[in-house]
Amino acid sequence: MAVAMMVDNPEGTQEAYDAIRAHLGLQKPAGGIFHVAGPSPNGGWRVIEVWESEQEADTFFRERFIPTLRTLGLAGPPPPREFWPVHNAMQ
């Protein structure tokens, strides 16, 4: 079942996001359906994604995202991820 995920990182910046994206590359990860990011209305940086499953999002997070943060020296505790089931999505 597809899931949506949101991360609001109050410490996030466009510069950090751009560095992470450059390191990860622009290829869609396995299980990734949709990705959007920008300044959070609460300050910091917000990412919203749709994944084929929460397990695929977790695999990407564990195997690629966290190692990228460490490589770039951004290895504080990651902000919490919020998941919910997707009933409908338009592309």
Predicted regions and their residues:
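Short S/T/G/P-rich N-terminal loop/turn motif that feeds into the first structured element of a domain
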Residues: 1-63, 73-91
